[in-house]
């Protein structure tokens, strides 16, 4: 019934298995891939006819995690997977980025890649095996895909690179780098690092590229046995159209791209395009070429003109040379009520970044395959359409916004203080108010400034820069701080963030083959130079965290209590903790480890809650005097609340120095009294005394009463002696 084909190899100390022909046989390509006990299903379906009226590749990648893969049932009311999680969105992008450049130019058939996690062993992250499975499914599908690609994760432990470290090993690694590419070239890099040098980062990229070659070979072997016949597709030849466009518009395009203001440049380019269209596709006249071909050729000519200008003259669209960073202005404290804020402007790219400090109540609960965990650092990136002078959809964040936010998160995260030193939940929001390239790196710079403005003790300021590349044969130019046009028309998007000590995040997307290790080294070195310049400009606004938290930020004090006292602090059904919160106004978070976080913008509220909790968990000292309140009277004595939530008994014999016939003759419920803690009886009951305490001054009368009793005994003894004489 099944014509199953299979490839196996030992990779990174674990078995990788690729299998096809058994599951999802109606898809154009389907591969079940397993790594350890993590298993995914990747499918590819591409429509038979091109989608009309579009000039881009209609590729969609969906990565989805199923809770059953880890033996779990989804949370929430419906107990069913819903909208994609952040992890699913990020992995979808991770798969998309290296495969998109490998589709043959001109492919306009709707193509969908779906990767489903079927099993997760909680050791091997599904993202790498998902990329491998998607590559294999595309290679088998018959669509014009110039792969396959391989992918690998690289860690850095004890000064050594580690191929595909486990989830547990990643906790100790100073590097989390994912690299993907073909047998000949690197196409994509995504990473977070703990301030590592550039040569270590580049070494990790090349280490990963070398070690995923066996995976590519396994996919090729599988394709030789199971691949479908290639689709009959011939890319459109635009050679003649491009010649015609160049003849009409090259000079005007070169002039348009000398305009340094973005909106003026766009208007000039649109005018050239209209001139070309009028000449080659005249209204009411005979068209020399199809309109869609002319539009496609014009885009190609645009790219060539920009690239030729840069390679021939070393001068870029806005007049800069290849190494110069646009003018930078950094401002902090721009929003009066925000805990921390910054406005970072670099040329025509601007980010308004706001940092907010919260408490344990504000932590984000994330329901992942590995289980539910809390996230205390959130970074959200918003890209409204007005930032590029357009109208558009507003609403929930798209994939691009989530991806850019995570890139900035990775850049800043390694610099944050540990939770036990700075027990705040942090949320950073970046509002991109203007954009002309490199807005994610503006977010990194603005986030660093906003957090320091809020008083968050970052180890060092962090900055980011976006690099570009123009490659034509043997000639190339690496561009620092690229514009939006240079990003779209160039061959590489290379983002590097870090401090003066090293790199914290590296993201690379390469659109063509031929990017050598040497070119990447030049780009990294040039990025380091640019990053140092940007850090210097940022230092004009702020060089380190402010010594105090923002005026409106909550204050948090932590205390450690014995774990066996947690129940007493919470109380039956939460009664005690609710009372503390209601009466002090402070927020209280108690962790299973006994760490208590008390938060409020009012220092007095924190102190009151702190003392209350301390009184519950602390033990009274024998012989000490405490203020108390009579809470109940009995025939044999009075119960007094005296040490926070502690109650003790003042026996009738301890109420007053003289004999007491009736308890209520001395005290009534609600009376404020002073008591001395005598200790506990054999049953653990607390014993108190009032008679040895001056109820006015709180003075301990024990010695005074003892002296009086001794004097009384002496007088009695003398009286008896006198009577005997």
Swiss-Prot record:
It comes from the Bacteria. InterPro entries: ExoRNase_PH_dom1, ExoRNase_PH_dom2, ExoRNase_PH_dom2_sf, KH_dom, KH_dom_type_1, KH_dom_type_1_sf, NA-bd_OB-fold, PNPase. It is found in: Cytoplasm. Residues 554-613 form the KH domain. Its cofactor is Mg(2+). One of its GO terms (biological process) is mRNA catabolic process. It holds the Pfam family KH_1. Residues 623-691 form the S1 motif domain. Residues 701-719 have a biased composition (Basic and acidic residues). Residues 699-725 are annotated as: Disordered. Mg(2+) binds at residues 487, 493. Coiled coil: none annotated. Involved in mRNA degradation. Catalyzes the phosphorolysis of single-stranded polyribonucleotides processively in the 3'- to 5'-direction. HAMAP family: PNPase. This is Polyribonucleotide nucleotidyltransferase.
């Amino acid at each position: 019934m099944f014509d199953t084909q299979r490839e196996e190899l030992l990779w990174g100390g674990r078995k990788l298995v690729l299998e096809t022909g058994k599951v999802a046989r109606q898809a154009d390509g389907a591969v079940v891939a397993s790594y350890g006990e993590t298993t995914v299903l990747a499918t590819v379906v591409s429509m038979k006819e091109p989608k009309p009226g579009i000039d881009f590749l209609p590729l969609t990648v969906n990565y989805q995690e199923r809770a059953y893969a880890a033996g779990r049932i989804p949370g929430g009311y419906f107990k069913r997977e819903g909208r994609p999680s952040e992890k699913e969105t990020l992995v979808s992008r991770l798969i998309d980025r290296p495969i998109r450049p490998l589709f043959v130019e001109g492919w306009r058939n709707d193509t969908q890649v779906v990767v489903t996690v079927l099993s997760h062993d909680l050791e091997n992250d599904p993202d790498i095996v998902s990329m491998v499975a998607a590559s294999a499914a595309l290679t088998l599908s018959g669509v014009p895909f110039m792969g396959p690609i391989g992918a690998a994760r690289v860690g850095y432990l004890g000064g050594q690179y580690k191929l595909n470290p486990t989830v547990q090993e990643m906790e100790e690694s100073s590097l989390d780098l994912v690299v993907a590419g073909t047998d000949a070239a690197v196409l994509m890099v995504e990473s977070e690092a703990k301030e590592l040098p550039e040569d270590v980062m580049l070494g990790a990229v090349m280490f990963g590229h070398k070690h995923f070659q066996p995976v590519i070979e396994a996919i090729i072997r599988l394709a030789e046995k199971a691949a479908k016949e290639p689709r009959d597709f011939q890319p459109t030849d635009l050679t003649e159209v491009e010649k015609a466009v160049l003849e009409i518009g090259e000079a005007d395009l070169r002039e348009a791209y000398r305009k340094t203001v973005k909106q003026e440049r766009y208007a000039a380019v649109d005018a050239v395009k209209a001139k070309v269209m009028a000449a080659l596709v005249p209204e009411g006249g005979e068209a020399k070429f199809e309109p869609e071909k002319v539009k496609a050729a014009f885009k190609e000519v645009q790219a060539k003109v920009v690239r030729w200008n840069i390679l021939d003259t070393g001068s870029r669209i806005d007049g800069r040379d290849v190494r110069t960073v646009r003018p930078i202005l950094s401002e902090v404290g721009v929003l009066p009520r925000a805990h921390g804020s910054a406005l970072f402007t670099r040329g025509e790219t601007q980010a308004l970044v706001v940092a907010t400090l919260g408490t344990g109540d504000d932590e984000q609960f994330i329901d992942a395959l590995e289980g539910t965990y809390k996230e205390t650092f959130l970074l959200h990136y918003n890209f409204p359409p007005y930032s590029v002078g357009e109208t558009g959809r507003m609403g929930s964040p798209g994939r691009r916004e989530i991806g850019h936010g995570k890139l900035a998160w990775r850049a800043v995260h390694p610099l944050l203080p540990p939770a036990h030193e700075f027990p705040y939940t942090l949320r950073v929001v970046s509002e991109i108010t203007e954009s002309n390239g490199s807005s994610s790196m503006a977010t990194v710079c603005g986030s660093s400034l906003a957090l320091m403005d809020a008083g968050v003790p970052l180890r060092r300021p962090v900055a980011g820069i976006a690099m570009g590349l123009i490659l034509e044969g043997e000639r190339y130019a690496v561009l620092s701080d690229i514009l939006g046009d240079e990003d779209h028309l160039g061959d590489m998007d290379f983002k590097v963030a870090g401090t003066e000590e090293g790199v914290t995040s590296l993201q690379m997307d390469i659109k063509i083959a031929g990017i050598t290790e040497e070119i990447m080294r030049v780009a990294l070195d040039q990025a380091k130079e640019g990053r140092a310049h940007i850090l210097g400009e940022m230092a004009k606004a702020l060089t380190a965290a402010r010594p105090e938290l923002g005026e409106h930020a909550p204050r948090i004090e932590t205390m450690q209590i014995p774990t066996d006292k947690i129940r007493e602090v919470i109380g039956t059904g939460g009664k005690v903790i609710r009372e503390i919160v209601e009466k002090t106004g402070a927020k209280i978070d108690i962790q299973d480890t006994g760490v208590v976080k008390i938060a409020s913008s009012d220092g007095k509220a924190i102190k009151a809650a702190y003392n209350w909790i301390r009184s519950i968990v602390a033990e009274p000292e024998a012989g000490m005097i405490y203020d108390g309140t009579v809470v109940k009277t009995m025939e044999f004595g009075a119960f007094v609340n005296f040490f926070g939530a502690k109650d003790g008994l003042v026996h009738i014999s301890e109420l007053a120095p003289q004999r007491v016939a009736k308890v209520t003759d001395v005290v009534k419920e609600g009376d404020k009294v002073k008591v001395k803690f005598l200790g506990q009886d054999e049953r653990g009951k607390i014993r108190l005394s009032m008679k040895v305490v001056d109820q006015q001054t709180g003075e301990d009368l024990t010695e005074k009463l003892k002296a009086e009793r001794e004097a009384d005994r002496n007088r009695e003894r003398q009286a008896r002696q006198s009577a005997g004489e």
